[in-house]
Amino acid sequence: MAAEEASRSSPRFRREPKGRVSRQDKYSVLLPTYNERENLPFIVWLLVKSFSESGFNYEIIIIDDGSPDGTRDVAEQLEKIYGSDRILLRPREKKLGLGTAYIHGMKHATGNYIIIMDADLSHHPKFIPEFIRKQKEGNFDIVSGTRYKGNGGVYGWDLKRKIISRVANFITQILLRPGASDLTGSFRLYRKEVLQKLIGKCISKGYVFQMEMIVRARQLNYTIGEVPISFVDRVYGESKLGGNEIVSFLKGLLTLFATT
């Protein structure tokens, strides 16, 4: 009995009261970027607007991987405009992968919650207050945006890409049974310590990395809440999804199926 009480008093089991945001809560938004010069000012402005209106404490950490289009210069200007207490540029010299970008960002994050999202305007910051409310209502370890539940959806894709996405998600649901409706989405809120542990367990790269994060979360018995979101295809620049990514996705899916 005493052992059980001690276990429940450990950091893993301590939870805030449901439905309440603590004054100490801070949300660190990680924005990995590569060639996002046009999109970055818009997404940062929308983030600042959303957090200012909702009243949540926040910081935005930009992790630029040596973009040749001047993304770093834009980020430096944004840091000056909004202040280094809100915008932190933490660049790297070259592309080193999404997982390592999150690790790099978390080293500089002072929040106890981490929000990950795309910097290309595919994910609208207006959903962040819903993520936070959902997390507090259920004391979830993770809250994931979903395109495949409720009033969630995808806009700006042609029919072919929508079909590929639906089929890929259907296959992953059958093979992996993840307990979440959208495995490949990258708009999520994590408890910081949960994200740190999951990244330490994951070995995948690219788009499969997001899938593995949810699969490992299920294995570790972390709780996952979902919020329907509208995903909009990138406004500026070219999509980074191509034939090589699709092949990597299929290989990664089979690897996860065989090892989880």
UniProtKB/Swiss-Prot annotation:
Keywords for this protein: Acetylation, Endoplasmic reticulum, Glycosyltransferase, Magnesium, Manganese, Metal-binding, Phosphoprotein, Transferase
Residue spans crossing the bilayer: none
UniProt-annotated stretches for the region Disordered: 1-20
Chief location: endoplasmic reticulum
Residues that, per the record, bind GDP-alpha-D-mannose: 32, 34, 36, 63, 65, 118-120, 147, 234, 240
Residues engaged in binding Mg(2+): 120
Cofactors demanded by this protein: Mg(2+); Mn(2+); Ca(2+)
Record-level Gene Ontology MF annotations: dolichyl-phosphate beta-D-mannosyltransferase activity; dolichyl-phosphate-mannose-protein mannosyltransferase activity; metal ion binding
Modified positions (N-acetylalanine) in chain numbering: 2
This protein's GO CC annotations: endoplasmic reticulum membrane
Co-factor: note: Binds 1 divalent metal cation.
Binding site for Mn(2+): 120
Domain of life: Eukaryota
Keyword Glycosyltransferase (UniProt): yes
Enzyme nomenclature, EC number: 2.4.1.83
GO biological process, one term: dolichol phosphate mannose biosynthetic process
Phosphoserine found at: 9
Known pathway: Protein modification; protein glycosylation
Record's catalysed reaction(s): a di-trans,poly-cis-dolichyl phosphate + GDP-alpha-D-mannose = a di-trans,poly-cis-dolichyl beta-D-mannosyl phosphate + GDP
Cellular compartment(s): Endoplasmic reticulum
Known role: Transfers mannose from GDP-mannose to dolichol monophosphate to form dolichol phosphate mannose (Dol-P-Man) which is the mannosyl donor in pathways leading to N-glycosylation, glycosyl phosphatidylinositol membrane anchoring, and O-mannosylation of proteins; catalytic subunit of the dolichol-phosphate mannose (DPM) synthase complex.
Family to which the UniProt record says this protein belongs: Belongs to the glycosyltransferase 2 family.
Subunit structure: Component of the dolichol-phosphate mannose (DPM) synthase complex composed of DPM1, DPM2 and DPM3; within the complex, directly interacts with DPM3. This interaction may stabilize DPM1.
PANTHER family xrefs: DOLICHOL-PHOSPHATE MANNOSYLTRANSFERASE SUBUNIT 1 (PTHR43398:SF1)
Name of the protein in its database record: Dolichol-phosphate mannosyltransferase subunit 1
Source lineage: Eukaryota, Metazoa, Chordata, Craniata, Vertebrata
